[in-house]
């Protein structure tokens, strides 16, 4: 942090500058160096512009499929050494609805760190077939609901990375049909209910120039998590399958790399890779197992569809992203991916 009268090098000033603006509380920080003839040093004057304490926003998008979405959010922040940030976000859509409440405390410690508490409730529907224009008469093939609370501790790692340790507890409910030939009008969905405790550690470095469609920078992360809990299976027709309960525990490791290499002023080549290794076993049936398996969803559209071919507890995925930058705010990009499951989940008799 900056303090009046401190002596520091230009590298110290650069590092402290980026630390000061990285938390988002200061929108602009203009340094001005004045030479002091008496001491032979420079005095550094800082002019800071602080974000408003209370802010809000609204957004959304319109799609010809079931992915229409509206997002509303509010943010409150204080500016102090032990500052507080509170976020409230809600999303409403035909296939996805969620609410998120989070509070972050920046701690006054020798090593800068933060403590973040988060409560989330969400519901996502996956449909058997996407039509050109959405019809609300089409039932969802898989519906996933979850509610959880999580506590995170974040701190710097090396020079330009961060480490986040988190613990959380939550419940999930999956509703699904175990066959795509079932008569939706006469049958109800089977249910799998989960109560889970999860502890994780993540190392992350991200300097991409855009969240949605970047053309420069690198996002690299390594995640390790340990999960423990229970699954309760509740079939619609108990004459074909009986209720069951089993204890779950598994270890999962993930590695992700997403980087962009400049080829020329107009052309950029993006590279993407992801590896997942998990000891998670089979659940009550094929549909519940594949619904809870880690999914590879590199594009916005892939996050809205349920594709069993891109789900596995262990897989390696890689892709290339050639980009033509037509102008500053206009680009033409293609994305090509390969998905290779190490441990493929095969469909068999459900009962």
Segments (PLM) and residue ranges:
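Acidic/histidine-rich, surface-exposed loop or edge segments in extracytoplasmic proteins
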Residues: 2-3
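Gram-negative/organellar outer-membrane beta-barrel architecture
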Residues: 6-212, 220, 291-300, 305-318, ...
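C-terminal outer-membrane beta-barrel translocator/porin domains of Gram-negative envelope proteins
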Residues: 196-327, 331-350
């Amino acid at each position: 942090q900056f303090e009046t009268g401190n002596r520091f090098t230009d590298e110290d000033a650069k590092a402290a500058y980026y630390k000061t603006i990285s938390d988002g509380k200061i929108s602009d920080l203009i340094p001005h160096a004045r030479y002091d003839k008496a001491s032979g040093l420079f005095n550094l004057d800082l002019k800071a512009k602080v974000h408003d304490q209370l802010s809000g926003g609204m957004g959304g998008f319109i799609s010809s499929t079931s992915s229409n979405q509206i997002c509303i959010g509010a943010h409150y922040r204080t500016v102090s050494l032990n500052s507080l940030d509170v976020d409230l976000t809600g999303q409403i859509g035909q296939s996805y609805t969620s609410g998120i409440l989070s509070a972050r405390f920046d701690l006054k410690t020798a090593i800068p760190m933060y403590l973040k508490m988060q409560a989330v409730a969400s519901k996502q529907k996956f449909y058997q077939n996407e039509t050109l224009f959405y019809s609300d008469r089409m039932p969802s093939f898989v519906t996933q609901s979850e509610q959880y609370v999580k506590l995170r501790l974040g701190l710097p790692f090396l020079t330009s990375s961060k480490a986040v340790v988190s613990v959380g507890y939550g419940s999930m409910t999956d509703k699904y049909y175990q066959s795509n030939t079932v008569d939706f009008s006469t049958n109800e969905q089977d249910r799998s209910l989960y109560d889970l405790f999860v502890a994780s550690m993540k190392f992350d470095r991200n300097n991409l120039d855009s969240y949605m469609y970047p053309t420069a920078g690198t996002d690299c992360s390594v995640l390790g998590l340990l999960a423990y809990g229970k699954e309760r299976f509740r079939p619609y027709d108990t004459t074909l399958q009986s209720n069951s309960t089993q204890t779950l525990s598994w270890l999962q490791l993930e590695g992700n790399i997403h980087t962009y290499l400049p080829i020329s002023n107009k052309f950029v080549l993006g590279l993407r890779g992801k590896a997942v290794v998990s000891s998670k076993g089979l659940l009550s049936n094929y549909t519940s197992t594949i619904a809870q398996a880690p999914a590879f969803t590199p594009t916005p559209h892939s996050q809205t569809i349920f594709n069993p071919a891109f789900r596995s507890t262990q897989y390696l995925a890689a892709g290339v992203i050639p980009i033509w930058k037509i102008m500053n705010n206009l680009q033409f990009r293609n994305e090509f991916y390969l998905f290779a499951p190490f441990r493929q989940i095969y469909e068999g008799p459900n009962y």
